[in-house]
């Protein structure tokens, strides 16, 4: 991505269920790599949490830690169709693994609205419905 950057979680418009966890230290379940602690994350632990964020560019993703408690997230861009993603990886049962999931990679250039929510679905191996990430990974113009 030739214009890739991290957009702050502070730009999110929280509808319900999300909170910023300052200086995140892990959940007590699953190991955490030392470079992933002490960072502010935005986190939702239950189904139905929703937020929206405006961004400018052609791609958006979530740099997250996919641990033992993550579930299936759903998102849409602008007024598009809802899509879903199981965040759980083959390492998630024992580790909050850092992972960047690119939700959209080939959007038309311009300003877009990402709506993100947690669902009531999860991987059979997961113990929860959580989602937590540190920023929005955007390919596009830096916002002012």
Predicted regions and their residues:
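Glycan-recognition surfaces in beta-rich domains, encompassing non-catalytic CBMs
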Residues: 1-144
């Amino acid at each position: 991505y030739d214009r890739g950057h991290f957009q702050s979680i502070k730009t999110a418009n929280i509808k319900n269920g999300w909170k910023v966890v300052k200086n995140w230290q892990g959940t007590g379940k699953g190991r955490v790599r030392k470079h992933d602690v002490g960072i502010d994350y935005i986190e939702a632990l239950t189904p139905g949490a929703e937020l929206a964020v405006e961004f400018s560019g052609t791609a958006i993703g979530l740099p997250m830690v996919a641990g033992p408690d993550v579930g299936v997230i759903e998102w849409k861009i602008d007024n598009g169709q809802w899509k879903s993603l199981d965040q759980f990886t083959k390492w998630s049962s024992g580790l909050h693994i850092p992972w960047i999931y690119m939700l959209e990679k080939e959007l038309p250039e311009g300003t877009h609205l990402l709506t993100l929510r947690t669902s009531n679905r999860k991987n059979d191996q997961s113990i929860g419905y959580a989602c937590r990430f540190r920023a929005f990974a955007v390919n596009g113009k830096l916002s002012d």
